[in-house]
């Protein structure tokens, strides 16, 4: 018998009986700000303003205005849960994904009869078609520009179909058949394809796939140079599952869709057409972004003309709170893999592990664990930090620690800054570098002298490693190891 294909429902079946990882509620919730407001207290975490915490994924079964739709949020809002869903140690997920990138399993196309994503089909030509009534996209806060698709995997291809790619973008529902999509300039392959179509003044066919195996979602967030132009990140998910991701031909567009997605929106990125992101609200805000602040509404988003909405029977709408721990998992773990790949190529064996903690939203900060064999390795840790900035341009802060420090425990990491760090010796500041435009401190008015354009930044390296010739003076207190210590709690 063939193995059951991986999809969101198979993953949920594996975790649904664990109350630490999954909870359902039948209490009615309004998708307009209330749903995200509720989950903020239960399990959002990340850079969300306190009070918040790490908690279970939540399935909301009674969504106001959408009687036939369930909404899932927080599925990846725990690194331990991601490890459980990937059947792998959460502490070495970066290494695991690095191996997956190097050994991709290409997706395969199946017949429509084998694609549950096409169980139910609505076309834009149908009477009364309105994506705002078909797709239960939540609004994160009352200030949002509108309902957002926050974890939709966009599938697109080059004009000659020789290359295809998947990426995740924020997309706001603007009208009955219109989405605004933010494609950050530079680095995104979907953006390169869209530019190609726009120069030819042709609409670009795409599909937006929602409600997926988290292996697909997390794999889709890899960026260059780890996944170069022409690398389809669905191969990463295939490697994680040792099973090809299944695709199906679109119903109304000449493009592939993910065959086991809960929802698929088909349509076209329209050439030379733009829309004001907050055209329906005029709040000046988009939605909460990973640094923990509301993003500014973009005055000129690219436009997606929707031609169809398809979904599974009893479909699950999946959503992510922008600054939550879920984003940390989605962006941070692939970034760890990217850093490990580049650093190990240049200085093999010297960086034992990497962690992008919630404080940086998965993008802005990394903690690197360093191994020194002898005095010739002194200084190699700072070269590793510089390589990390090369691997991921949006990285802002690197903290270097020794192997006796738990990089997943921020108290242990901060301890190194208090006992293994002198600011006048162990601090590196790198000015005038490129970073992420969503960091509000990277605006010219913050520092007109050094920040000429938005998205420029000074980067920081904190070297909390012990000088090799002083290792014996920094040995931590060694307590007795007691194998059966847990019996004292019974």
From Swiss-Prot:
InterPro entries: UbiD, UbiD-like_C, UbiD-like_N, UbiD_Rift_dom. Its cofactor is prenylated FMN; Mn(2+). One of its GO terms (biological process) is ubiquinone biosynthetic process. One of its GO terms (molecular function) is protocatechuate decarboxylase activity. The keyword Cytoplasm does not apply. The active site is at residue 289. It holds the Pfam family UbiD_C. Keywords: Decarboxylase, Flavoprotein, FMN, Lyase, Manganese, Metal-binding. Induction: By gallic acid. Binds 1 prenylated FMN per subunit. Its EC number is 4.1.1.59, 4.1.1.63. Transmembrane segments: none annotated. Prenylated FMN binds at residues 168-170, 187. Mn(2+) binds at residues 165, 233. Disruption phenotype: Cells lacking this gene are unable to decarboxylate gallic acid and protocatechuic acid. It catalyses: 3,4,5-trihydroxybenzoate + H(+) = 1,2,3-trihydroxybenzene + CO2; 3,4-dihydroxybenzoate + H(+) = catechol + CO2. One of its GO terms (cellular component) is cytosol. The keyword Metal-binding applies. Belongs to the UbiD family. Gallate decarboxylase does not form a complex composed of Lpdc, LpdB and LpdD. The term subunit has been used in reference to the three-gene operon. Gallate decarboxylase LpdC is the only protein required to yield the gallate decarboxylase activity. Involved in tannin degradation. Catalyzes the decarboxylation of gallic acid and protocatechuic acid to pyrogallol and catechol, respectively. This is Gallate decarboxylase. The lineage of its organism: Bacteria, Bacillati, Bacillota, Bacilli, Lactobacillales.
């Amino acid at each position: 018998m063939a193995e059951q294909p991986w999809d969101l429902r198979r993953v949920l079946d594996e975790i649904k009986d664990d109350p630490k990882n999954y909870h359902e509620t039948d209490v009615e919730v309004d998708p307009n700000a209330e749903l995200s407001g509720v989950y903020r207290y239960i399990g959002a975490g990340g850079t969300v303003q306190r009070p918040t915490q790490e908690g279970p994924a939540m399935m909301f079964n009674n969504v106001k205005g959408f009687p036939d739709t369930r909404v899932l949020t927080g599925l990846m809002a725990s690194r331990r849960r991601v490890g459980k869903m990937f059947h792998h140690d959460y502490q070495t997920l970066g290494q695991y994904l690095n191996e997956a990138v190097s050994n991709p399993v290409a997706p395969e196309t199946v017949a429509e009869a084998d694609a549950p994503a096409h169980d139910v089909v609505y076309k834009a030509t149908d009477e009364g078609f309105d994506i705002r009534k078909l797709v239960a996209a939540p609004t994160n806060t009352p200030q949002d520009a509108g309902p957002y698709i926050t974890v939709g995997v966009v599938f697109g291809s080059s004009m000659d179909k020789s290359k295809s790619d998947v990426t995740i973008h924020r997309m706001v529902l603007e009208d009955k058949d219109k989405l605004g999509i933010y494609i950050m300039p530079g680095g995104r392959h979907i953006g390169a394809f869209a530019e190609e179509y726009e120069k030819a003044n042709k609409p670009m066919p795409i599909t937006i796939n929602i409600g997926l195996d988290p292996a697909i979602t997390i794999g889709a967030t890899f960026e260059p140079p780890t996944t170069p132009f022409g690398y389809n990140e669905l191969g990463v998910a295939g490697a994680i599952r040792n099973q090809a991701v299944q695709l199906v031909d679109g119903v109304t567009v000449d493009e592939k869709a993910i065959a086991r997605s809960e929802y698929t929106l088909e349509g076209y990125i329209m050439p030379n057409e733009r829309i004001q992101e907050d055209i329906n609200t005029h709040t000046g805000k988009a939605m909460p972004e990973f640094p923990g602040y509301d993003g500014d509404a973009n005055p000129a988003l690219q436009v997606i003309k929707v031609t169809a909405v398809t979904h599974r029977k009893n479909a699950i709408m999946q959503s992510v709170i922008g600054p939550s721990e879920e984003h940390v998992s989605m962006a941070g773990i692939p970034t760890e893999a990217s850093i490990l790949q580049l650093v190990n190529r240049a200085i093999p064996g010297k960086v034992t592990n990497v962690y992008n903690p919630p404080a940086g939203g998965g993008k802005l900060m990394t903690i690197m664990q360093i191994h020194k064999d002898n005095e010739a390795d002194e200084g190699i840790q700072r070269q590793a930090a510089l390589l990390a900035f090369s691997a991921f341009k949006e990285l802002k802060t690197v903290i270097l620690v020794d192997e006796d420090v738990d990089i997943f425990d921020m108290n242990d990491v901060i301890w190194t800054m208090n006992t293994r760090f002198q600011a006048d010796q162990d601090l590196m500041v790198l000015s005038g570098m490129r970073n992420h435009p969503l960091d509000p401190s990277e605006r010219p008015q913050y520092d007109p002298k050094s920040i000429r354009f938005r998205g420029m930044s000074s980067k920081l390296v904190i070297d909390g490693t012990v000088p090799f010739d002083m290792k014996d003076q920094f040995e931590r207190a060694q307590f007795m190891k007691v194998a059966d210590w847990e019996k004292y709690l019974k």
